[in-house]
């Protein structure tokens, strides 16, 4: 876009849209994986607190 001489606002808008799409995809992937891991841990009688904390920490760190 920059090589095409697009306005700076257009470039920033596209970058923000890309970031938003990636953030949503990451959220979906992490939540799906977390759900699977929690179910598996519950079936084994294991504590799920650490799994949830790790998932939240990963999401926070990725921002």
Curated annotation (Swiss-Prot):
GO terms for cellular component: protein-DNA complex. It comes from the Bacteria. One of its GO terms (molecular function) is transcription cis-regulatory region binding. InterPro entries: Metal_Tscrpt_repr (IPR003735), Metal_Tscrpt_repr_sf (IPR038390). Pfam families: Trns_repr_metal. GO terms for biological process: negative regulation of DNA-templated transcription. This is Uncharacterized protein YrkD. It comes from Bacillus subtilis (strain 168). The lineage of its organism: Bacteria, Bacillati, Bacillota, Bacilli, Bacillales. The gene is yrkD.
């Amino acid at each position: 876009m920059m090589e095409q001489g697009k306005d700076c606002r257009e470039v920033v808008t596209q970058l923000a849209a890309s970031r938003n799409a990636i953030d949503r995809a990451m959220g979906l992937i992490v939540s799906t994986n977390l759900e699977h891991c929690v179910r598996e841990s519950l079936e084994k009688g294991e504590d799920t607190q650490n799994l949830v904390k790790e998932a939240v920490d990963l999401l926070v760190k990725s921002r």
